[in-house]
């Protein structure tokens, strides 16, 4: 078929009827009788299919036999206003070409309700469903909005390394990378693995955060952001954990904790409103199919100013509440999800940015307050999912940073370069991390993080 | 300093003089006498510094002592038209705050010429140099242009997995990933590594290409693209090889090889012209400092239509040329860089897209031509660097694909899901891969691929 293919999303919104068009896509359903057949065709450009009307007598019954759910076809026909209900336009087929059949006796995606659990097992096919089409389009638009936002701010996309010889947080389970034959590792005289013979000449891991390298970028280019894959070798089989996920980490020179909070709020509101504008149909589909509070939650974030709340004040509010919590409340605890949700959903009824955490529950690199016991960390707390962003102003004073590292008995052998940034032209700076899948969960309203990434990596699963 | 910080790139182009401004950045140089001091300040937003004029008597000589190359400072002052040559505006300082000193006796980046080799050793500091500032800003704008282009085409950013249990090309050196204790691996009764006890329950590697998973996306969403890190465990210590690099792989349903070639040409022209527009100063700096043919090369690509050239015709031209080549020419060879450059730089004098390669030098998944000996692969050949893009129309026929796999004695145990796309609703489709660093090399005019990524990973080097 030589006519230029039109995307269905464009045809559904065109005011320009009564013209010949060509569409190509996958059959969702076919129904009808011996005279007329209706095909719902989807090409992935939108959750909505376009209706193809086929004159069975004219095109021949035989040509329709293999047009079953999942088959791939091309249609030339006339685009007309639809007489039927439920759609605005339809195509009267002149010509049909079959690219690929999908034998109903073996094709797993038939026209019926498939559970999300079942679809997870056939992750290689699930992008062809309406649900995952919606999720993946939203995922795209969120990613695009993130680049657009930071580009507009004048921040530069900075590729921090995936393979690393240092551990960004002084903790965390990491995957090891090697090109040694692990069945038969070369050993040193002491019986240790001889890493001088490994590809990089040392032991290497998959990164758990790009922040420390990101700081190097910020202290040179002013403002940077990362957007790349991050890995955790935690054997947590939960709806909230992935071994491989994507993370966004802006880092900005000359930003203090207040600038950082303002940025986080503005950023989240921008990307969520972008998604609501450009993924309207997809969000509506998910709202109506899975989670009828979804749009409400999104508007909740957009229409409220995020409350700034010191940790100590948060503890006071929780202590004085009459709520029964599973975990006890006292100054020094790491807040649990139940506490965060109480503050956001019941007490303030708006997103909360909590700051000035006890230093003992936060990372070594956070800027120390003068009180000697708190640091300028910040967590952005959302309804339903709790923490969506974690960040801080960074300790820019070389001596204070060294002292804290000593207190924590950390080895900084592999991080001398990080400390050097505080020796050479140090500057106040801040940043935060946003787990991309956490964001996609929030904007799609899905419950399981394995449903918002194309090919989830979890314990015992690296398929496709 | 409570005044809002202005970015130097904005001040250098403002028509709005004689107002108080605040700038923050790193000192490139300071010179002057006992009455007046000139500081060149850079904040990473542009390659150009802004000149700060300091009345030494007014601000006190002592306050200036630690303002040496690399120090980080904040300035409040009056933005005025410059009387000096070489700059349009300058700032008359009212107030200076020192954020961080950079002791000249230890700070490695002094005001002198540093070789690229030396800067590679201090990769953690080199973003602070003019050269790497330019490269990294260009890198950002190219990445942004890529997202912008595909978004406009209606293609969706699709995250293919980094950790994989399959080898995309049936070849290639891969890094292994594990959370086993490799010094003491669990073994099966047969003495093999017991991968059932590894994190994913099987042997896993870092991906060498997202293409195969990308095809799953394209055959559901219509058009997708990937942009993520790719890994090769090849011990090649050359200016063209990295163990970790970034790759862009669009994959589009219903595109044939001609659509694919048109897309590749339009795409490359778009992103290169975007860079020339948004990175004008940076490209000029690199042109004038390292490679005075850079801008010429970029214009060469923009102003010429890319020639479409069948491999067989290319061989004929090479055979009939009077050029002396190191490697012999005959039908069936994989072209060498010298051949590609002859065709591009001497014969056609324009970029070339070569197609219809002998099947034996290309991958199993390329669409087979009717002649039984060629496939619909395509390489885009550029001046100076040779192949910048490699792609193909994919074999969409299940039987032909199976037959080819058998011919090649490939094991497809881990790729049943890939074959399934040809069983269920298969469609003609095409795609290509662009090595991002190869592109950045071309647009920056740099010679060594280690100089166009922030933290290069190469044999024996995973530092920072």
From Swiss-Prot, chains A, B:
Disulfide bonds: none annotated. The gene is asnS. Homodimer. It catalyses: tRNA(Asn) + L-asparagine + ATP = L-asparaginyl-tRNA(Asn) + AMP + diphosphate + H(+). This is Asparagine--tRNA ligase. Its main location: cytoplasm. Keywords: Aminoacyl-tRNA synthetase, ATP-binding, Cytoplasm, Ligase, Nucleotide-binding, Protein biosynthesis. It is found in: Cytoplasm. It is an enzyme of class 6 (ligase). NCBIfam families: asnS, PRK03932.1. Its EC number is 6.1.1.22. One of its GO terms (cellular component) is cytoplasm. Belongs to the class-II aminoacyl-tRNA synthetase family. PANTHER family: ASPARAGINE--TRNA LIGASE, MITOCHONDRIAL-RELATED (PTHR22594:SF34), ASPARTYL/LYSYL-TRNA SYNTHETASE (PTHR22594). InterPro entries: Aa-tRNA-synt_II (IPR004364), aa-tRNA-synth_II (IPR006195), aa-tRNA-synth_II/BPL/LPL (IPR045864), Asn-tRNA-ligase (IPR004522), Asp/Asn-tRNA-synth_IIb (IPR002312), NA-bd_OB-fold (IPR012340), NA-bd_OB_tRNA (IPR004365). GO terms for molecular function: asparagine-tRNA ligase activity; ATP binding; nucleic acid binding.
């Amino acid at each position: 078929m030589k006519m230029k293919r039109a995307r269905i999303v464009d045809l559904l919104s065109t005011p320009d009827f009564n013209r010949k068009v060509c569409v190509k896509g996958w059959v969702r359903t076919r129904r009808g009788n011996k005279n007329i057949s209706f095909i719902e065709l989807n090409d992935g450009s939108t959750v909505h299919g376009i209706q193809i009307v086929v004159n069975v007598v004219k095109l021949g019954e035989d040509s329709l036999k293999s047009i079953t759910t999942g088959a791939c076809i091309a249609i030339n026909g006339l685009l007309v206003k639809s007489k039927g209900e439920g759609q605005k336009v339809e195509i009267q087929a002149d010509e049909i070409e079959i690219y690929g059949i999908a034998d109903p006796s073996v094709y797993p995606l038939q026209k019926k309700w498939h559970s999300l659990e079942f679809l997870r097992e056939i992750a290689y096919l699930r992008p062809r469903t309406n649900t995952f089409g919606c999720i993946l389009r939203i995922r795209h638009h969120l990613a695009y909005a993130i680049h657009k936002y930071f580009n507009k701010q004048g921040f530069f996309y900075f590729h921090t390394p995936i393979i690393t010889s240092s551990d960004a947080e002084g903790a965390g389970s990491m995957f090891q990378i090697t090109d040694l034959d692990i069945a038969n590792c070369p050993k040193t005289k002491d019986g240790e693995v001889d890493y001088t013979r490994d590809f990089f000449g040392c032991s290497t891991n998959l990164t758990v955060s790009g922040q420390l390298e990101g700081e190097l970028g910020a202290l040179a280019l002013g403002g940077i952001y990362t957007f790349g894959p991050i890995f955790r070798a935690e054997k947590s089989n939960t709806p909230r954990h992935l071994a491989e996920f994507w993370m966004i980490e802006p880092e900005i020179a000359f930003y203090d904790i207040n600038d950082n909070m303002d940025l986080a709020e503005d950023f989240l509101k921008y990307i969520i409103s972008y998604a609501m504008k450009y993924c309207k149909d997809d969000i509506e589909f998910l709202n109506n199919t899975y989670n009828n509070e979804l749009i409400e939650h999104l508007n909740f974030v957009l229409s409220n100013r995020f409350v700034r709340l010191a940790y100590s004040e948060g503890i006071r509010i929780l202590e004085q509440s009459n709520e029964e919590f599973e975990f006890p409340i006292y100054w020094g605890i790491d807040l649990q999800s139940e506490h965060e949700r109480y503050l956001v959903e019941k007490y303030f009824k708006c997103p909360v940015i909590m700051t000035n955490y006890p230093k003992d529950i936060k990372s070594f690199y956070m800027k120390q307050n003068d009180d000697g016991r708190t640091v300028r960390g910040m967590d952005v707390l959302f309804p339903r999912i709790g923490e969506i962003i974690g960040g801080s102003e960074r300790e820019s004073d070389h001596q204070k940073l060294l002292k804290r590292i000593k207190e924590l008995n950390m080895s900084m052998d592999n991080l001398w370069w990080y400390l050097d940034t505080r020796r050479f032209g140090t500057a106040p700076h801040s940043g935060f991390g946003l787990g991309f899948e956490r964001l996609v969960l929030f904007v799609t309203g899905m419950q399981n993080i394995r449903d918002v990434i194309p090919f989830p990596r979890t314990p015992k699963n690296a398929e496709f």
